[in-house]
Amino acid sequence: MFGWAVTFLIVALVAALLGFTGIAGIATEIAWILFVVGIILFVVFLVLGRRGRPPL
C-alpha cells in the first residue's frame, strides 16, 4: 500500500513540475488517502497482534 502511495506521490510531483495542477492535486490526494489507510491498518494489526492468541 505504501508503494502505491509513493507512486502517486511521484506522479503528483512530476505533474506539478510540468504544470498539470489538476492531475497533481488528484494524485496527491490519492497518495495521502493511501498513506492514511496504511497507517490505520498498521496500528490496527499492531494492537491485534499484541493481544496474543487465546488459550485453547
Curated annotation (Swiss-Prot):
Assigned GO CC terms:
plasma membrane
- Answer whether the UniProt record assigns the keyword Iron-sulfur to this protein: no
* Keyword set, alphabetical order: Cell membrane, Membrane, Transmembrane, Transmembrane helix
The protein's matches in InterPro entries, at most eight in alphabetical order, are given as: DUF1328 (IPR009760)
Q: What membrane topology does this protein have?
A: Multi-pass membrane protein
Localization (cell) = Cell membrane
**Stretches that traverse the bilayer:** 6-26, 29-49
Question: Coiled-coil stretches, from where to where?
Answer: none
User: Could you say which protein family the record assigns here?
Assistant: Belongs to the UPF0391 family.
Protein name stated in the entry:
UPF0391 membrane protein Noc_0484
* The organism of origin for this protein: Nitrosococcus oceani (strain ATCC 19707 / BCRC 17464 / JCM 30415 / NCIMB 11848 / C-107)
